[in-house]
Every structure is written in C-alpha cells, then in structure tokens.
C-alpha cells in the first residue's frame, strides 16, 4: 500500500495544521475502540485516520465538531423554553408560594447607611493563623 501523506489529504482539509489535529483526534478515537471505515492493512492508527480523511469516509466537518466538543470543559445548554414556561405558569397561579410577583420584588430588607456601618463595626476580626 502506498504511503498516505499530507498532500493526499490537503484537498479535503484546507489547513495542514487543522488536518494534523483532526487526524490525531481520529487516531485517538480509533485507539479507544472506535470503528474504522477503511481496511487497516496492518497500518497504525494515525495512518488509518489519514486514509479515512483522504478517502472521504469521514466528514472533516464532523471530525472538527467532535474535536471541539471533546475539548470543551463546560457545555452550555440552551433551555429558554423551560424558563419561560415556568414564569408564565407561576404568574398565572399567583406565584409558587402564593405571593404575587409585585410582592416578591419588594421583599428585600432595606437598611440605612447607619445600620450598615453599625453592622460592619460589630464584625469580629478572626485571629491570625498559620494556615496560609
């Protein structure tokens, strides 16, 4: 079997650095047990990944999406419908605890500046320890 080079795959993925990232990601998937889409022919995983990209058995866009998803630490999930349903139901029912929405907005305690300063003066400073 002829060797697979970056030149064989560069027409599928425009940027050679992106190609290396995608092929490396696919090679790691193969080593973790993912199903290969071409004959192995006793090749190593990076070569199989490059052959899959060159023969277009995998979509580079799908590989890129999967790579991005695997690198994300926090995935945001949009659920605006649930929040709007809860708000509309609670406003119709008079609130969760039986209070109206106008009462909930004004339920905060209001303190004067003097009360805040008196509260700050009443705080006790913790003793210094060797923990830090």
Curated annotation (Swiss-Prot):
Protein name from the UniProt record: DNA-directed RNA polymerase subunit omega
Keyword Transferase belongs to the record: yes
Entry-linked SUPFAM superfamilies: RPB6/omega subunit-like
Keyword Membrane: no
EC numbers: 2.7.7.6
Region span, Disordered: 90-109
A Gene Ontology term for the protein's cellular component: DNA-directed RNA polymerase complex
Any one Pfam family match given in the protein's UniProt record, by short name: RNA_pol_Rpb6
Top enzyme category: transferase
Family statement drawn from the similarity comment of this UniProt entry: Belongs to the RNA polymerase subunit omega family.
Gene Ontology BP, a term: DNA-templated transcription
Entry function: Promotes RNA polymerase assembly. Latches the N- and C-terminal regions of the beta' subunit thereby facilitating its interaction with the beta and alpha subunits.
């Amino acid at each position: 079997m002829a060797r697979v080079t970056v030149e064989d795959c560069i027409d599928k993925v425009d940027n050679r650095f992106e190609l290396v990232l995608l092929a490396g990601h696919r090679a790691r998937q193969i080593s973790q047990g993912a199903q290969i889409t071409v004959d192995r022919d006793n090749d190593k995983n990076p070569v199989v990944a490059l052959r899959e990209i060159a023969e277009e058995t995998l979509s580079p866009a799908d590989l890129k999406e999967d790579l991005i998803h695997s690198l994300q630490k926090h995935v945001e999930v949009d659920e605006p419908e649930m929040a709007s349903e809860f708000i509309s139901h609670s406003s119709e029912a008079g609130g969760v605890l039986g209070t109206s929405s106008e009462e909930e907005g004004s339920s905060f305690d209001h303190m004067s500046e003097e009360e805040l300063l008196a509260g700050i003066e009443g705080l006790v400073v913790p003793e210094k320890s060797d923990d830090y």
